[in-house]
Structures are given as structure tokens and as C-alpha cells.
């Protein structure tokens, strides 16, 4: 854990991705941010210590030890408290690349800044009260969002919608606990115990219902945040790789007429109507003597077991094979979409035989080669998991595994309250579980959380954020 001095010294980091580009940004935050920048900044007689806040300035970065020119820059000065970290912040826009930006960073470190740890700028925003813990976590969700729907969910959480709901539930519990304490301390009336247990029961049932309603969004929220693990399966050479390439809109998998050309599991993300699909193009699942191909087949079996959705591709220009039947049987009961590919060719597959094997499922006929029927596939995927609606902009979704676990614990605590009251337990014992629920909800927004957890959460962020 960092020392108090280390937590609030002046930090610096590169805030843009490494590599070539037009612009790179180096960020400073802390009490000495402006003073350190002033040591290396040159622009006539301009003194950064005297410029107004939230202004940008043209100039040069120069090594003060030897007057060597480092770069031509635009430098922003933003003074506390109206900054991302609520500290003095300086952002230096220099030319992109690796050498220039690293020389600039090393110069700032030499002049008194400390290299920021991953996520430390956002951690300071949290510690300084600019955002709560759930909002801070939404920053990383926003950075990692793979679709506009996932972005909307993250923005919603960053804007404080989840925080507002959690805090309102905590306030409901706090008000109830306060009333219970008053009733316990001043039992002037004969029916005070009955009134107290009634109050506890009503509030526990109300808050639990609110939490359970929130938890109903968890599955969709996690899909939007992490992606829907989708395995494309089928016997060799039915068009799995062609389907992957179509969905990706680019050539990622080898497409040939030779069975077994996909030797491994290929993973790619794709946006299907707002649903982030983690597409897994598997090697054909078949018996093989080829050692390398056999490894791919085993990985395919594992990918199949771990998938949220299966796209099972059959070739309708050929009769059903024993391998097709085995795949249909192996995926029975799982969320799947059955695709009859190569509809542009003469049909040899017996539809009656297939209907007997999957009597209650919709089967989509497509031609990946001619791009026919694939809009229906995308609509089917969105409908399977979101009823056609994905990540509405103003909706609050629970997508974070930590939040889901804490809400589950909070709901269990409230159930213990209800069970205790129904069993006739004393009020002072029942309210312990109510207090425990209040604590669990507090961990979501960071009101009651250990320093070690905070350090762990922010260590998952990228440098410079």
C-alpha cells in the first residue's frame, strides 16, 4: 500500500497509446505539477505560475541542464479543484512517436515528478471525492467498450445513475435503522415492538425487491461489458471461417476447400446490432491423426463448453453426416442458432430429417458467399439475448462482477432479516443483518471498502488514466 506522502505527490505519465501518431499527451497531476512544467517550458517570458486556469499555451520543451530542445508543444494548465483529479493538472501535447514522448516524460521525472502507477489519476479522482468507486470503475469500462451500447452503459454509470440508486437504498436502510434505534431506546408504548418489526419487514422487502430488479439486468450488462462468447462450430469445410470473415468484414481465417485448414481456435470481437460478440472460429470437431489438428479439435471442444451462444453451421448442399448429427446432439439444450449454409447451391440435405432432430427450433438458411440471410442471423442473435433491445441509453445495467456479488450478498442479508422477523427473533439481532446489507451496498460506491481492494481495482487500469 502507498504511503500518505506517495499518494499525494506529483505524478506523471503518458496518457496516449504508445507508437507513431500525430499527437501524444503527457499528463502531470499534483501540487507541484505547474512548477515542474515551468522548469522545462519556454515561451518568451511567459510564466506558467501566473497564467489563468484552464488555458492552453504554445511553446517549447527544453532541458534546463543544457538548453537542448526536446519538442514544440501545446501545454494546458488546469488548477484545482476543477480538474479530473481535483489537483493541479498539466497536460503537454507533443508530437507523437516513441522517442520524443519518452524524452519528455523522463525530463519531468528528473525535475521532481514520480512515475504514475496504473490508474493512479483516476484513483486520485476517487480519493479526492470527484467520483465514487462505481464511477471510477466505469472509466475503465468506457475505455474498453466494444460497441456503442456498451459505451452507453458505461457513460450511464460514470454519470452517477447507479451511484444515485445505491445511495438512495442505503438511505432507506439508514432511516429504518435510526427509527428502530429510537423505538428500542424509548419503549413507552406497548405496541412499539410490533411497530418496529413491521417497519423492518416492510423496508427489507422493499429494498430487496429493488436489488433483485437491478440484478435482473446483470446478464445483459455482463454481455455488453465483456462480450458474448460465441462459438462457430460445424464439421470441416461447411463455411465456418467464411462466416467469421463476413461478420468481421475482413479476412481473418483461411478459407479453402481443404478440410482441417483451421488448425486452432480463432478469437475476434465483432459488433452485432450493439451486442459485442467474442467470436470463436473453432477447428472442425472430428477424429484426426494430425497431432497439430488434434490439439485444435480439443480446444474447440473446450470453447464449445464455455460458450454463451453457438452458431452451428450445416451444409445444405450435402446430406447430413454422422458428424452433423453428433454436433446437433452435443449442443442440444444450449443457446444455439442452426444455420444451413450454401443455400445458393442445389439442396441435398433432407429437411424432414433435420426437423425430426430439432423439432422446436427455427433454422436459418443462408449463403455466406452471396451474403444472403445474414441480416436475419444478426437479428436473431440480438433477439435471443435482449429481445431485440440492447443497452438503452438511459437504462441502468449491472455489468461489473464485483457489483453483482455485493448485490447478491445484500439481498441475502435482507432475506435473513425477513426470516428472522418471521421466526420471532429479537429486533436487536435482526437489525444486524440490515446493517450488513447497508455495508455491502456501501462497498459498491466505495463508502466502506478496504485500502487493499482500492489498490487492486485501480491497478487494472492503464498507465496515464
UniProtKB/Swiss-Prot annotation:
InterPro entries (UniProt xref): G_TrmE, GTP-bd, GTP-bd_TrmE_N, GTPase_MnmE, MnmE_dom2, MnmE_helical, P-loop_NTPase, Small_GTP-bd
Binding site for (6S)-5-formyl-5,6,7,8-tetrahydrofolate: 27, 91, 130, 465
Cofactor: how and how many bound: Binds 1 potassium ion per subunit.
CDD domains, per database record: trmE, TrmE_N
GO cellular component assignments: cytosol
Coiled coil: none
Subcellular location: Cytoplasm
Any one biological process term the GO annotation gives: tRNA methylation
Family indicated by similarity: Belongs to the TRAFAC class TrmE-Era-EngA-EngB-Septin-like GTPase superfamily. TrmE GTPase family.
PANTHER family named among the record's database cross-references: TRNA MODIFICATION GTPASE GTPBP3, TRNA MODIFICATION GTPASE GTPBP3, MITOCHONDRIAL
Family annotation (NCBIfam families): mnmE_trmE_thdF (TIGR00450), PRK05291.1-3 (NF003661), small_GTP (TIGR00231)
Protein name as catalogued: tRNA modification GTPase MnmE
Protein species of origin: Enterococcus faecalis (strain ATCC 700802 / V583)
Origin organism lineage: Bacteria, Bacillati, Bacillota, Bacilli, Lactobacillales
Gene name for this UniProt entry: mnmE
Amino acid at each position: 500500500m502507498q504511503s500518505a506522502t506517495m499518494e499525494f505527490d506529483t505524478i506523471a505519465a503518458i496518457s496516449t497509446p504508445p507508437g507513431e501518431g500525430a499527437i501524444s499527451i503527457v499528463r502531470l497531476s499534483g501540487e507541484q505539477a505547474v512548477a515542474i512544467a515551468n522548469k522545462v517550458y519556454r515561451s518568451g517570458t511567459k510564466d506558467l505560475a501566473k497564467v489563468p486556469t484552464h488555458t492552453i499555451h504554445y511553446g517549447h520543451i527544453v532541458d534546463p541542464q543544457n538548453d537542448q530542445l526536446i519538442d514544440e508543444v501545446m501545454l494546458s494548465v488546469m488548477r484545482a479543484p476543477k480538474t479530473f483529479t481535483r489537483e493541479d493538472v498539466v497536460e503537454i501535447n507533443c508530437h507523437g512517436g516513441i522517442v520524443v514522448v519518452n524524452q519528455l516524460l523522463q525530463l519531468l521525472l528528473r525535475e521532481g515528478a514520480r512515475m504514475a502507477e496504473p490508474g493512479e489519476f483516476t484513483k486520485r479522482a476517487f480519493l479526492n471525492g470527484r467520483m465514487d468507486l462505481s464511477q471510477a470503475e466505469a472509466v475503465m469500462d468506457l475505455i474498453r467498450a466494444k460497441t456503442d451500447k456498451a459505451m452507453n452503459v458505461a457513460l450511464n454509470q460514470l454519470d452517477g445513475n447507479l451511484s444515485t440508486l445505491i445511495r438512495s437504498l442505503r438511505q432507506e436502510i439508514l432511516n429504518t435503522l435510526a427509527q428502530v434505534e429510537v423505538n428500542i431506546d424509548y419503549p413507552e408504548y406497548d405496541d412499539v415492538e410490533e411497530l418496529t418489526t413491521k417497519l423492518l419487514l416492510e423496508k427489507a422487502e422493499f429494498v430487496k425487491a429493488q436489488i433483485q430488479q437491478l440484478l435482473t439486468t446483470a446478464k445483459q450488462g455482463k454481455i455488453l461489458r465483456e462480450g458474448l462468447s460465441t462459438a462457430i462450430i460445424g464439421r470441416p469445410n461447411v463455411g465456418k471461417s467464411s462466416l467469421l470473415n463476413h461478420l468481421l468484414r475482413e479476412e481473418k481465417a483461411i478459407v479453402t476447400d481443404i478440410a482441417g485448414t483451421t488448425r486452432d481456435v480463432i478469437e475476434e470481437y465483432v459488433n452485432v446490432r450493439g451486442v459485442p460478440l467474442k467470436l470463436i472460429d473453432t477447428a472442425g470437431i472430428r477424429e484426426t491423426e494430425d497431432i497439430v489438428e488434434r490439439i485444435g479439435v480439443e480446444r474447440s471442444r473446450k470453447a464449445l463448453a464455455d460458450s454463451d451462444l453457438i452458431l452451428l453451421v450445416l451444409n445444405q448442399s450435402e446430406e447430413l453426416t454422422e458428424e452433423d448429427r453428433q454436433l446437433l446432439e452435443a449442443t442440444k439444450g444450449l443457446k444455439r442458432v442452426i444455420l444451413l449454409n450454401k443455400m445458393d447451391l442445389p439442396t441435398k440435405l433432407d429437411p424432414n430429417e433435420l426437423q425430426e432432430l430439432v423439432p422446436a427450433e427455427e433454422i436459418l438458411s443462408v449463403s455466406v458467399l452471396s451474403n444472403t440471410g445474414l441480416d436475419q442471423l444478426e437479428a436473431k442473435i440480438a433477439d435471443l439475448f435482449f429481445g431485440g433491445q440492447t443497452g438503452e441509453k438511459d437504462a441502468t445495467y449491472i455489468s461489473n462482477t464485483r457489483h453483482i456479488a455485493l448485490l447478491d450478498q445484500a439481498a441475502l442479508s435482507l432475506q435473513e432479516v425477513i426470516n428472522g422477523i418471521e421466526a420471532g427473533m429479537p429486533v436487536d439481532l435482526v437489525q444486524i443483518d440490515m446493517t450488513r446489507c447497508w455495508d455491502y451496498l456501501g462497498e459498491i460506491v466505495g463508502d466502506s471498502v478496504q485500502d487493499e481492494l482500492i489498490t487492486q481495482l485501480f491497478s487494472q487500469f492503464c498507465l496515464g488514466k
